[in-house]
Structure formats: C-alpha cells, structure tokens
C-alpha cells in the first residue's frame, strides 16, 4: 500500500490541514459580486477542469507511486473536476437510505476499497506580493491524500467540508504537478450515512489562494440590535503577525457608513476586535434581505464580505428574529442533479433557490451536510433562513442485527455504537466545528444543527456544548436527541429547539398541552414522495395556531435520480435504487421531492405555494363587499408586497376581472378590510377568486408573479351549476321505438340511434353503440382499485390482502321493466375477490331513456371488516380517439380530497395527454375532485357524464393495472383506449410514505353510500 491507513484511524481525521476558518475569497482590491466573481479574484487560481484519472477496484491494486514527478500517466483517462467517478462509468451508483453500503464494523471499511488517482499539471508563478499559497478542496468523498510535485502535502476527510493546506514550500515557478488519491470509504463513512445516492470523487471546487505573509486569517461577525442602532462586533485572528487592519462598512448603495480598526482582544480565541455602530439600521430578514458590505483591508490584501443585521432569541418558548415571532416555511434540500450528481454549479443552485422563493418558502435546511459556501451567500441575498447542518449521520447503526428487536433495545444499541461512544467525540466535534467555523458570518443561518439521525449521547453533548460556547447568538437543534437509552441521564441543556420528524397532529397537540419551555420545530414533515403531500393545509393550520410551533421543513426539495438518456420509446430515462444491480438499496425512496430531478415542479410544489400564500381571505360579506385579509408575512406590509387581482366566475364563465391596489396598511400577522364591488347573477355556481401578485420585482422574482390565491363560493338564488342541472334533466323524449331482447346472459336494447348490451351476470354494460359506432373497447367495470401512490405504500398491502386489486363484480339477480321513459334495469350486485368474502353489496338501478341517455343509481354497503377503499366508481374503456375533454371542477392539474388547495373551480378544456402527471415511479395520478360534469370528445361524437353530487374522475391512456405493474415511467405502455374512471370518491393522499397515517377525514371509510351518474351521447360539445 502506497499510503498510511489514516482512513481507518479515528485519531487521524486530518493531517497538515489548516485550522478551520470563515469562508472568504481574498483579493488585492474590493470585490464586487462575491458569488458570481469568486474566481475573478487576482489571488485565486481555480483548478477545476480536465484532470488525468485512473480508477482502481481496490486500494491494494494501486501499487505505483503515481504522484511522483515524471510518472507516466499515459494509461490514465480524463475526467472533469468537479465530478464523481460513477458518472464516468467507474464503479456503480448506489442509493441507500438507512443501511450502510459496507459492513457495520467501525472504524474499519472493506479491504477492497475502491479508489481514484487524480493528476493535474499546471503552471504557476509565485507572486511577490502574495507569496504564501493555500490549496483548498471544498468537497471530496470520502477521504483523500494530496501531493504537490511529488511531495506529500496531507490527508483529510469529511466529504462536505473545506480542507485547506499550506503548499507554499512545495510549489515552484513553472510547471507543477498536483496529485490526489481519493478513497471511496473511510472511517468517516460511518458518519456520512445520509439518505442519498452514494458517489465518490472530487465533487466540489479546487483552488489555490495566494496571500501575503501576514494576513487576517479568521474573523467572526456578530450583531446586536439595540434601540435605534445596531452594534456590529468583529473579532479576528491573524496568520503570521498581527498587522494594521481597517474595517469599512458600506450600505447597499455602497455608501460608506462607518470605519474602524482592530484593537487587541486579550484572553479570547480571537486576538483582535472592532466594534461598529450603525444608526437606524436596515435589518436583515427573508422578506427584506438587506445586506451591508464589510471590507477588511490589510497591506496587500482585501477581504470583502456581506453582512446582515439581525438578532435571534427565544422568549417564553417562542422564536423571535428581530423581535418578531417567526414561522419557518421551509424545505429540506440535498445536493442532487440527475446528470452531475453531487456536483452543483452556481446556476443550478440559483435555480433551486429562485424556485423556492417563488413558491413562498422562506427557509431551507442544508440536509444533511454543509453546502458549498456560495449557497449561504445566495440565501443571504435572496432572503432565506437557513438551518446549517453538520456532515453527520450514522443512521445505519440503527439497522444492526439484534436478537431483541423491540424499540427500546434498538434505541439503546443505536446510541451505544457511535453517538454515545467516547471514541467518536473528536470526529463528531470536528464535523460540527467545520460546519460552524466556515459559515459563522452568514446572517441567513439562524440555527446550527448537529446532524441527522445518529441517536444521542456523549458525542453530541460535547458538540452542543462547544457550539453554544462558541456562538451564543444563534440557536441549536438536534432531532435525534429524542432517541435515548434508559441507561443514563442525558444533558439537553445546550439544545434550544425541540425538533421532531413527521409527528402527527395529535402528537403536536400533546406537546402544546404540556406548556413546553422550548419552541417546537418540524424538522421534517409532509413527506413529498410521488403524488403528495396531501396534508399541507392541516399542518399549516396547527402551525399558525400556536406561537410555540415555529414552523417546519417539508421533506424534500427534489427527486434524486440518475439520468440515463432516452429510452427506445423516446422517453427520458431516470433510474433509482436497485437499477444498478446493487445488493443493498432502498428502491424509489429517493424519489420524494417537490420537483422532478430536472426541477419541473410536481403538483405538490404548486400545493405548497398556495397553502403558504402571503395572505388569506378571512371573510367576505357579499352584501357590503367587505373582504377581510390576513397578512401571513413576518415582516412586510401587504400593501408594499402584493397587489390583488379578483375575478368572478359563474359556471366556468368569467364575468368580471379587475386589479386592486391596496391603499391601507395590513401589517404582519394583522388583518385589514377592503371593499370590492361585484355583481353576482341569480343562478349558477359562482366563485370569487382573489389572487396575490408581487407588487415589485426582486433579484429573483418578477414583478407581477402570482404568489397564491383564495376562492370564495358566492351566494345566489340558485347556486347549482346550470349546465350540470340541464344535463341532469331528462331530455325531450323521441318517438323512436325501443326494442328489448334477452338471453340468460345479456339484455339488449335497441333503437334507430343506439344499441346497448347489458350483462346480467356483472350488472354492467357490455356494449354501448351510438349511431352505429361502438364507444367501448371493453366492457364497463365497477372499480375499487387505484395504482398505489407512494403515500399508499403502508396501506397498499392491506388493500392487496383485501383483494381490492383483483375484485370483480357479479350480479345475483337482474330484472327489467319498460315504461314511458324507456327501460329500467334492477340488479343486485356484489364486488369480491377470489378466496375472500365480498367487499360490497350493491343495489343498482339503471335507466335507459328513449333518447339514448343512461343513468344509474347505486346503493352501496361495505363490509366493515375491510380497510378503507382506494376508490369506488365506474370504469369505461372508450375508444382511443377520444382525445379531448372538458370538465367543470377543480383544475387545471390533479386534485384529491386533501390535495386540492392549488386548484380552483372552473370549466377546463384540455386533452387526455395533458391529464397524465408523469411520476417517475408510476402511480395514481391526474384525477380531479369536486366535479359537476365531464365531456369527452372525438370527431363528431361526445360522451358526457354528470352526477347530482360532485364526483371525482380520471381520464388516462394508461390503465391502473399498468401503473401498478411498471416500476418506471419510461416503461409505461398506452392501453390503446381512453380510460375513464368516474368515482363517487377516492381515498385521500396524505404523506404516509414516511409520515403519519392518513387522517380519518380523508379516508374513504363510508360503510353505506349512494352513487349516481348519468351518461349522454351526442355529436357536439
């Protein structure tokens, strides 16, 4: 072996690295845009680009000293840095959530440990004015050794932290060689068991920083808000000798506010200190992210930084920022891109954060590791609170084999392996300090999180103690402190916020009833996997009911997947866990974001945006026109933030649309009243829709952007949908003769315009032919199954055990009669699966009118032994030529009984193709709830369905069996039919893939109900 085994030594996490420090990019002059221009500094040399690379299946296969000068790299290939070697065909991708990808044997890793050798030659001229050189790696997974010009520089680990080496003595003028050996696994792997794809290599930026001999090395900026002024304290330490340092503060227009010089600061970590007073300061918050510029000047070097003035505290278990009780409207975010993997560039980062702002998020958690430094600078600029999390997760220790697998024993053993093991105190403390030190000057960071899902013990007690001792201006949290052993008492004194993952509303209420002394934070909630989440509004309501509940962070921002080009059918091909032949994986559990891998929004993101809209209508008096609004922003006056657009729709027809500029203040968390002058017709289903639009553009959002809406049902003499009412009325009867013929199996009804065949054995229609054209591809069905959503993953097995996926209808008795209207057919029907008792008993009455219209009324009784139904309704397989549809209901995108807040009532004209929501893991999608009628159309033929009560429908080219069977969307095959599901109801969506059970009010648990539907056939819309 050509390197020492530091990678299995808990005592050696770093060798020859510089002490942790705040992030900055020094220059010889004041820098402009810090993010965009970070590599434009004349003191920074970027090493990103093409490197020579050779992969080895095992560290033992690497026998040659590739790092030596003159080594022949002709056998190497070329890769881009930053990058991960799995994307270049080396090794393979693996997704695992909890379980380790290696045996649980810390600190040891498999002897066949893959590694990658990187080499880059570069020219370098030692600058006379800045002769010292520091080599920075911002992210390498999992550990690495470094050589320059054949000389060993050092070793480091902690994948998502910056490692800095002093390479002054090994660089030379002219050509130099930089060599890096990266190992896939190290002892740090046991602390990096985050829920993500596992990738390896140099995945973040590499660069040299040139500096004078004597410079400001580290500094820490804190702020205190006093009456009519802010106090900025800057503490600093030096590399080399302390030198005179001037500090200048500029406002956002780059007007000088104040200047100071450092004075000695005896007896502290930092040797020097300066205090700057700002009169009538502009405070930083996510809604008004005002930033000052701080410039630190020494001879030969300038450090430029942006600072925000804000103050954080907890009082009476309520979290305040700048004296305002806040709510985190947050999301968890991983570094993930389907093409580049862990490698996230500036534009990718900007897009994520811009979409968050547009969707009304005000906070992001860096789950579960530090992000690149400019992520936090962008959050400062765009306005997002941040929970900054250390690179620490040992969740896999929970998966150890235990003879006694009860939860108490699992929890005890989980802690003992690592989190309550004194041998891991240095590693845990190191990861915490690396996180805190680098980003301690970022105003966006409100909370330091010690990590994720490690259990609790002495390691975190020490990390929390250090964090509170070093930075008393921010708060701390650590969710896994919840998991404890009964073997000893734990120290929780340095945890400021009690955080929980996926608590039910009842669990939240229990916490509130205890009169807690710490704020409650939902560090993860509303698991957004696939078609979901469906419970955002419920959590919103309880979050805003209690000041102690300071908000939450949805899990998570994006689906994780690996893009593999186009499939043979032309569809984009995304792969997830298990698709790479890996033995240990967690399937599609990584597909749990609010956006697709390419950042196309899921409907769940649209739902979030409207649930967390900036304002809400509290009440509307139709008589006086008084509309009461409540401001749900934390800091801004509504009249300065939004303008309104209101419209009146009746039966889907737009009657009125106007813009309204707020003239009076509506302060944060307060209510205000405006007057609207609207006219409402005497009949029709009428709605007032009030939309909220951004009044002024920002650096990330365009003026006029819609930030959400409210919809109010208006009162009138006849509030029924008049089109639906007309469709329900029996049409004028024709004199056409109706003929009936009957066999043991079928009842056939014929006129000069239609021919229908009713199956007496199923109680459903076998054929529907109008004007000589058959409408159905296959017989009509009763339908209680849906392709399980990701959030059905726990109830799904109950449904399968109950036979819902294979149930069939049978009729026990069918008889008919003819009257003046036409034919009435009476059937007694059940729904059952093989080997299981019947689920449903149904008394059905069908009517065939002489006009050709068909209606049905079903009285349904469910066996109470069975679980909640996925759905109940009728399924039609229409000919595939039915490509267009109109409907009145909740749209334009999919809606369900608990996932419908981003939809509004209207008349929508669309296509079957547009109804499909193309989740990467196929599942139920594209349904619409609260509908009055549906019309499907092909050339010269329409099929209309209408009910006396609002119903749900789904129209798709894909059968629910196909959606259930296939694992990836690119594998889906169209049925050839236009499949129409007309449902009395569907089960709700929820977030039970990782969250609580679907709430009772959204479960389809009715034991008796009545379903009716009417079908009309014609030649025009």
Segments the model singles out, each with a brief description of its role:
Residues 262-279, 653-683:
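Intrinsically disordered, low-complexity Pro/Gly/Ser/Thr-rich segments with frequent PxxP/GP/PP motifs
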Residues 148, 229-263, 626-631, 635-659, ...:
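Beta-strand-rich binding/interaction modules
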Residues 3-15, 33, 37-38, 52-56, ...:
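Accessory beta-strand-rich segments of carbohydrate-active enzymes
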Residues 87, 92, 99-108, 157, ...:
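An acidic-aromatic loop/edge-strand motif
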Residues 194-215, 569-621, 625-628, 632-640, ...:
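Catalytic cores of secreted or luminal carbohydrate-active enzymes
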Residues 87-89, 184, 285, 677-684, ...:
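Beta-strand/loop-rich accessory regions of lumenal/periplasmic or secreted enzymes
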Residues 172-175, 235-313, 686-725, 729, ...:
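Extended acidic/polar, glycine-enriched regions
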Residues 1-39, 96, 190, 211, ...:
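Extended substrate-binding grooves/exosites of carbohydrate-active enzymes
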């Amino acid at each position: 072996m050509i390197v020492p085994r530091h990678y299995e030594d808990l005592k050696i996490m770093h060798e020859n690295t510089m002490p942790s420090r705040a992030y900055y990019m020094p220059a010889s002059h004041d820098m402009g845009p810090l993010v965009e221009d970070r590599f434009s500094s004349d003191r920074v040399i970027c090493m990103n680009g093409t490197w020579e690379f050779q992969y080895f299946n095992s560290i033992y296969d690497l026998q040659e000293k590739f790092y030596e000068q003159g080594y022949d790299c002709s056998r190497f290939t070329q890769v881009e840095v930053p990058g991960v070697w799995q994307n270049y065909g080396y090794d393979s991708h693996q997704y695992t959530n909890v379980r380790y990808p290696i045996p649980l044997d810390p600190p040891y890793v498999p002897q066949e440990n893959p590694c990658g050798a990187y080499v880059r030659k570069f020219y370098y001229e030692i600058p006379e004015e800045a002769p010292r050189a520091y080599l920075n790696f911002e992210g390498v997974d999992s550990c690495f050794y470094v050589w320059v010009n054949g000389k060993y520089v050092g070793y480091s680990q902690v994948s998502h932290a910056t490692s800095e080496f002093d390479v002054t003595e090994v660089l030379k003028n002219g050509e130099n060689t930089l060599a890096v050996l990266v190992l896939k696994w190290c002892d740090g792997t046991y602390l990096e068991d985050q829920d993500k794809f596992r990738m390896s290599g140099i995945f973040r930026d590499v660069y040299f920083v040139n500096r004078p001999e004597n410079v400001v090395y580290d500094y820490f900026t804190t702020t205190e808000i006093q009456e009519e002024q802010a106090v900025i304290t800057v503490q600093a330490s030096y590399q080399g000798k302390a030198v005179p340092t001037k500090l200048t503060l500029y406002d956002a227009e780059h007007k000088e506010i104040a200047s100071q010089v450092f004075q000695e600061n005896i007896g502290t970590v930092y040797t020097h200190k300066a205090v700057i007073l700002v009169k009538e300061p502009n405070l930083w918050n996510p809604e008004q992210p005002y930033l000052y510029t701080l410039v630190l000047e020494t001879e030969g070097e300038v450090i430029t930084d942006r600072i925000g003035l804000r103050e954080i505290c907890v009082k009476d278990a309520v979290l305040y920022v700048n004296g305002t009780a806040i709510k985190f409207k947050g999301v968890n975010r991983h570094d993930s891109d389907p093409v580049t993997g862990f490698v996230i560039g500036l534009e990718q980062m900007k897009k994520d954060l811009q979409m968050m702002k547009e969707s009304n998020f005000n906070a992001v958690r860096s789950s579960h590791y530090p992000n690149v430094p400019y992520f936090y600078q962008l959050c400062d600029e765009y306005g997002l609170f941040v929970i900054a999390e250390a690179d620490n997760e040992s969740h896999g220790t929970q998966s150890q084999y235990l003879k006694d697998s009860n939860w108490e024993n699992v929890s005890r053993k989980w802690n003992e392996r690592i989190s309550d093991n004194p041998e891991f105190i240095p590693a845990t403390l190191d990861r915490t300090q690396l996180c805190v030190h680098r980003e301690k000057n970022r105003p966006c960071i409100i909370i330091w999180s010690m990590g994720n899902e490690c259990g609790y013990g002495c390691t975190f007690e020490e990390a929390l103690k250090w964090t509170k001792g070093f930075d008393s201006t921010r708060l701390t949290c650590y969710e896994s402190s919840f998991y404890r052993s009964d073997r000893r008492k734990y120290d929780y004194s340095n945890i400021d916020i009690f955080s929980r993952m996926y608590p039910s509303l009842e669990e939240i209420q229990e916490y509130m009833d205890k009169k807690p002394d710490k704020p409650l934070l939902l560090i993860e909630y509303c698991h957004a996997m696939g078609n979901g989440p469906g419970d955002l509004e419920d959590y919103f309501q309880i979050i805003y009911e209690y000041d102690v509940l300071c908000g939450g962070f949805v899990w998570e921002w994006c689906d994780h997947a690996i893009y593999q080009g186009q499939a043979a059918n032309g569809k984009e091909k995304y792969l997830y866990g298990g698709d790479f032949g890996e033995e240990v994986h967690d399937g599609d559990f990584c597909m749990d974001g609010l956006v697709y891998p390419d950042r196309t929004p899921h409907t769940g993101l649209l739902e979030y945006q409207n649930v967390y809209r900036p304002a809400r209508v509290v009440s509307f008096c139709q008589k006086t026109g008084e509309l009461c609004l409540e401001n749900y922003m934390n800091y801004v006056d509504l009249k300065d933030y939004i303008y309104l657009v209101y419209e009146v729709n009746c039966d889907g027809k737009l009657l009125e649309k106007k813009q309204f500029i707020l003239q009076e203040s509506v302060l944060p968390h307060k209510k205000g009243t405006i007057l609207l002058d609207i006219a409402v017709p005497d009949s029709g289903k009428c709605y007032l829709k009030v939309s909220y639009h951004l009044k002024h553009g920002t650096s990330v959002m365009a003026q006029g952007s819609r930030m959400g809406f409210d919809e109010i049902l208006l009162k009138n003499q006849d509030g029924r949908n008049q089109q639906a009412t007309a469709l329900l009325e029996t049409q004028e009867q024709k004199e056409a003769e109706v003929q009936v013929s009957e066999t043991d199996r079928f009842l056939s009804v014929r006129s000069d315009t239609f021919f229908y065949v009713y199956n007496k054995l199923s109680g459903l229609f076998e054929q529907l032919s109008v004007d000589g054209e058959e409408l159905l591809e296959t017989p009509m069905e009763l339908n209680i199954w849906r392709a399980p959503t990701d959030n059905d993953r726990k109830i799904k097995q109950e449904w399968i055990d109950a036979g819902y996926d294979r149930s069939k209808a049978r009729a026990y008795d069918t008889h008919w009669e003819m009257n003046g209207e036409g034919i009435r057919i009476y059937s007694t029907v059940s729904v059952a699966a093989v080997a299981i008792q019947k689920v449903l008993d149904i008394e059905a009455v069908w009517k065939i009118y002489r006009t050709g219209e068909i209606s049905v009324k079903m009285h349904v009784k469910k066996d109470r032994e069975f679980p909640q139904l996925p759905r109940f309704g009728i399924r039609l397989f229409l000919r595939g030529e039915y490509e267009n549809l109109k409907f009145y209901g909740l749209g334009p995108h999919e809606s369900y009984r608990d996932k419908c807040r981003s939809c509004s009532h209207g008349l929508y004209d669309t296509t079957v193709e547009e109804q499909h929501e193309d989740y990467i893991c196929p599942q139920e999608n594209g349904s619409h709830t609260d509908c009055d009628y549906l019309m499907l159309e092909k050339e010269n033929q329409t099929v209309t369905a209408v009910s006396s009560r609002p119903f749900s429908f789904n129209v798709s080219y894909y059968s629910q069996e196909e959606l259930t069977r296939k694992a990836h969307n690119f594998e889906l095959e169209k049925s050839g039919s236009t499949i129409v599901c007309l449902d009395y109801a569907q089960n709700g969506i929820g977030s039970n893939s990782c969250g609580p059970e679907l709430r009772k009010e959204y479960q389809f648990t009715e034991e008796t109900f009545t379903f009716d539907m009417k079908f009309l056939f014609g030649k025009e819309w």
